[in-house]
């Protein structure tokens, strides 16, 4: 069964960025109960991706954290996992009781999904990020417009640091996604504590 989200942080994986063991890194992250984990490892053959899902899913279930697949084959998932789709593949749906999310890059896309059964949207990239070198960030105004156009909760992605969390939440986002920082840090628990602290102070400004 997929449990209800509590925190606002979504962990997006990038196993190749981990200096140490990927699963030890994930165990530390899962101990902090993020809203969900999105397994984004599109470079893997499907057989290897499936093996990774089967190894990570029990860890997520033990922690009570939903696992979402975003692998090499659009719409592919396993029982017990959600699925993340691009806007182009939005009609694939899937994810069973864990549902599916859709990535959007324009307010018009969010508006087009108002009648969709998608559980949530991911909007980005909001701030400059090494993952999108040379591509201009869309900014907080873009995020506000997406949140206003959407029916579903919106999660921001791209260059999210603890210090930027208040701006993201005040723009209307339900939460935010973090990838590289969580994969590269030697102390994920300490980093996530900083993110959670900013969640608590977001509306005190």
Predicted feature descriptions by range:
Residues 174:
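Short, glycine/charged-rich "phosphate-handling" switch motifs in NTP-dependent
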């Amino acid at each position: 069964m997929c449990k209800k989200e509590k925190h606002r942080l979504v962990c997006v994986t990038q196993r190749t960025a981990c200096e140490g063991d990927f699963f030890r890194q994930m165990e530390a992250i899962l101990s902090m109960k993020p809203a969900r984990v999105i397994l984004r490892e599109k470079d893997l053959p499907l057989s290897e991706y499936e093996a990774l899902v089967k190894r990570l899913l029990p860890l997520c279930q033990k922690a009570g954290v939903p696992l979402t697949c975003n692998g090499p084959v659009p719409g592919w998932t396993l029982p017990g996992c959600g699925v993340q789709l691009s806007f182009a593949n939005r009609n694939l749906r899937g994810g069973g009781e864990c549902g599916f999310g859709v990535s959007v890059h324009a307010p018009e896309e969010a508006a087009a999904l108002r009648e969709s059964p998608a559980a949530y949207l991911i909007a980005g990239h909001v701030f400059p990020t090494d993952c999108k070198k040379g591509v201009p960030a869309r900014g907080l105004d873009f995020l506000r417009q997406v949140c206003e156009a959407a029916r579903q909760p919106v999660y921001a992605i791209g260059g999210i640091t603890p210090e930027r969390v208040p701006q993201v939440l005040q723009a209307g986002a339900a939460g935010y996604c973090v990838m590289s920082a969580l994969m590269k840090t030697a102390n994920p628990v300490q980093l996530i504590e900083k993110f959670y602290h900013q969640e608590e102070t977001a509306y005190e400004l």
